[in-house]
Amino acid sequence: MTIGNKQNTKRNRFTTLSAFFNFIINTLDPGLQNPCEASILKKMFKRSQIIQWNILEKDIVNEIIFRTTNPRNRIMLELMSRAGMRISEVLKLTPNDTDGRKLILRHPKSGRDKELVYIPQRFSNRLEDYIQMKGLGNNERIFPITYGTARGMVRKAGKIVNVLLRPHDLRRFAATYASRSGTPIEIVSKVILRHANLSTTQRYLGKEYGSTPT
């Protein structure tokens, strides 16, 4: 019933089996015990609670970005909130990873050799200007700061508008705003968030059962 199947399929089959035993008990054998009522099985096939993420509004994100005066920080915030990049992906970027409106992610989380991120031309121009201003070599990191420093920068940016802000809130905003603007969920999933499956994107958008974001 369960081997080789996804957890959601397992839960559905468990529910069906439990309903079958209840039917037998109610119609044929009231003394029969439903084996699906065993606590260990109920715990194993328990459905996850729905998680409601706090989604940032567009005007809040715009204000955060516009009021961030440090060029490096502003570009990093835009890469997360406009392009849907993970903070770890932003920190790995080098000039060699930029190709006009395309950013190349090498050895991404998905396990592929590379993935592409698409950004507006105007934003691409500002990124190139920043790289030239810093005089960076092709393989130097564009944002040579630690993960902790980057998270702290995001939190500080959120305080500008009295919002508790985390890097993944910005990535989730990119997905939500695109979806609300009419972008098909398949495009949001494969192009913006680069998820392996659609169900992960649905959780981002609050349309499925919650789990840890990726």
Say what each PLM segment does.
Residues 17, 76-77, 84, 88-93, ...:
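Alpha-helix N-cap/helix-start motif at helix boundaries, enriched for small hydrophobics
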Residues 98-100, 164, 183-203, 209-210:
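Short, polar N-cap/turn motifs at the start of nucleic acid-interacting alpha helices
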Residues 1-50, 134:
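N-terminal core-binding DNA-recognition domain of tyrosine recombinases/integrases
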Residues 147, 163-182, 195:
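Short basic/aromatic active-site micro-motif
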Residues 83, 88, 92-126:
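Conserved tyrosine-mediated DNA breakage-rejoining catalytic core shared by Y-recombinases
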Residues 120-163:
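Active-site/catalytic core of tyrosine-dependent DNA strand-transfer enzymes
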Residues 58-87:
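Basic, Lys/Arg- and aromatic-enriched nucleic-acid-binding interface segment
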Residues 44-62, 111-121, 137-138:
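DNA breakage-rejoining catalytic core of tyrosine-based enzymes
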